[in-house]
């Protein structure tokens, strides 16, 4: 299995009515033994490529081989050794966890003692053992992804194609999912993980960066990040707010991209630019600008040619709201909501002041949506107050 590879030779896919190919001619090789990330924004061609590798779409030109099999000509042989987990869970939500596993085992012709041993291993691997009788539709997003992965692994595939498995999954479940996938890769499985999340891309040993159907980069994320050394900066001004400061900076020819980060403005400068160019630029107020550690996101945006330096249309129509700075505008006081004996929120207290961006963080089932619904008047609190 350590020799398992995917090879693409001029692989291309076009759809009627599109000016550009969904996947431009691709040439690359993907190896087993570690997780390879297929990274790009929505519409980059990630799902189309995955479907061609799984034999679900026929390429218009070029070819692919997956561990020696042509996905179209040898589809039966390939499907026996390939696991494909699509963006949608691929689960039957009106069936229980065990019923879903049994269905996939039937489809894979896994029977008898082999089925029993496989289920025991997968239920332990995914920590779904206590939930075998629960309907799939009643599982959290993270648990659904674990069940989807378990169903995909029933046939013990040599190749695993995961199409954006981290979407809609809370950070704790996503971390557990990554641990499971890294363990599988360590056993020699070939794993291709599709994502638009750049923090996920950094967890991959190798990445394929795509945009508008084209492959822009293949290699280690760290190697690409290192190309941004000396070009990432944090900027503040004692005389101007960050939003106005960002608008000014984005109009400068020396700036490739910028965004507000906490209490600073993060800038990516073009290769030939220096911090002094920004300090002395016409129209810029007094600023403090210091180099910061580059991120993979900086390199990715720069590779795309920058995210655009024109003023945001939305930002242009937003105006400062009058009010007392520091005034509390949203408040939860002992906010509690119970559904029967279950407390979805339990005496929650917080206050949001004018001008703040307040993050309400937590895993699936933590009570975030319930809190929002009470704040919006869509749910009546069991006790406590929601003030807006």
Protein language model features and the residues they cover:
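ABC-family P-loop ATPase nucleotide-binding domain
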Residues: 1-14, 284, 290-337
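Short, charged/small-residue-rich alpha-helical element at the C-terminal edge
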Residues: 229-303
């Amino acid at each position: 299995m350590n020799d398992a590879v995917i090879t693409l030779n001029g692989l291309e896919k076009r759809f009627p009515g599109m000016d550009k190919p969904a996947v431009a001619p691709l040439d690359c090789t993907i190896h087993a033994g570690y997780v390879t990330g297929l990274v790009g924004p929505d519409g980059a061609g990630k799902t189309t490529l995955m479907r061609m590798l799984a034999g679900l779409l026929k390429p218009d030109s070029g070819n692919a081989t997956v561990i020696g099999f042509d996905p179209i000509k040898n589809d039966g042989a390939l499907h026996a050794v390939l696991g494909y987990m699509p963006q949608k869970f691929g689960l039957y939500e009106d069936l229980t966890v065990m019923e879903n596993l049994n269905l996939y085992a039937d489809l894979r012709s896994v029977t008898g003692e082999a089925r029993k041993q496989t289920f025991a291993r997968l239920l332990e691997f995914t920590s779904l053992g206590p939930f075998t009788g629960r309907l799939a539709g009643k599982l959290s997003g993270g648990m659904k992804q674990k069940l989807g992965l378990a169903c995909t692994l029933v046939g013990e595939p040599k190749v695993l194609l995961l199409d954006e498995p981290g979407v809609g999954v809370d950070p704790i479940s996503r971390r557990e999912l990554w641990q499971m996938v890294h363990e599988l890769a360590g056993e020699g499985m070939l794993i291709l993980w599709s994502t638009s999340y750049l923090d996920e891309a950094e967890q991959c040993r190798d990445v394929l960066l795509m945009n508008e159907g084209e492959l822009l980069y293949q290699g280690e994320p760290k190697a690409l990040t290192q190309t941004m050394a000396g070009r990432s900066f944090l900027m503040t001004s004692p005389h101007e707010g960050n939003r106005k400061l960002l608008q000014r900076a984005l109009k400068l020819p020396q700036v490739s991209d910028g965004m507000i980060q906490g209490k600073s403005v993060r800038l990516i400068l073009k290769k030939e630019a220096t911090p002094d160019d920004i300090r002395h630029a016409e129209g810029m107020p007094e600023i403090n600008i210091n180099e910061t550690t580059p991120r993979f996101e900086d390199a990715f945006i720069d590779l795309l040619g920058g995210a655009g330096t024109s003023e945001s249309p939305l930002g242009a129509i937003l105006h400062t709201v009058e009010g007392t700075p520091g005034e509390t505008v949203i408040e939860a006081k002992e906010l509690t909501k119970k559904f029967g004996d279950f407390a979805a929120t339990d005496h929650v207290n917080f206050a949001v002041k004018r001008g703040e961006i307040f993050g309400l963080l937590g895993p699936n089932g933590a009570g975030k949506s319930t809190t929002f619904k009470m704040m919006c008047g869509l749910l009546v609190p069991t006790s406590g107050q929601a003030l807006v």
